[in-house]
Amino acid sequence: MRNIQSLDIKKFLPHRAPFLMVDSVISIDDEHVATSFKIRQDDIFVVDGVFSEVGLVENAAQTCSSIVGKSYFDEDDVEGEGAKLIGFISAIKSVKVSACPKVGETIRSDANLVSRFDADDYSICTLSCTVSTSDKELLSCVLNLFIQKIN
């Protein structure tokens, strides 16, 4: 993906509001991705003005899935027309939550591919991810994901 500034993440993830937990991709390649997400009062995982632990894990999973998901699209496909994907967390190998962000804060998620197995139309992968605000780490985790092309 060469022009990530024009990338509409909704075209590459199967999630839709109110369950979309990524606003934009900051950088992406075959082994790393960085995303951002602004916490809003109407987010499904906000309770009493705080984005919950479950929301942080879901944000990490959506961020992680974009590394493997991008391989199902052509390099110049910034419209997300090349494939439709589904995916889910198959295991949470480890998770540590240090703090939860408040409404109005923007979180940054950085994920790295640890391992990957590809079959004809699906991938099973392990990824590590950290989620932070500008001044502190909120979450670190290792997730297993299953990603499948459905068309």
Regions found by a protein language model. Name each.
Residues 20, 62-73:
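Ordered, amphipathic secondary-structure segments that act as subunit-interaction surfaces
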Residues 10, 24, 48, 96-100:
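Beta-strand-rich interaction surfaces with strong enrichment in secreted/lumenal proteins
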Residues 2, 68-110, 142:
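Hydrophobic beta-strand-centered segment that forms part of the acyl-chain substrate-binding groove
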Residues 6-16:
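Short aromatic-glycine motifs in intrinsically disordered, low-complexity regions
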Residues 15-21, 103-108:
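Short coil-to-beta-strand transition motifs
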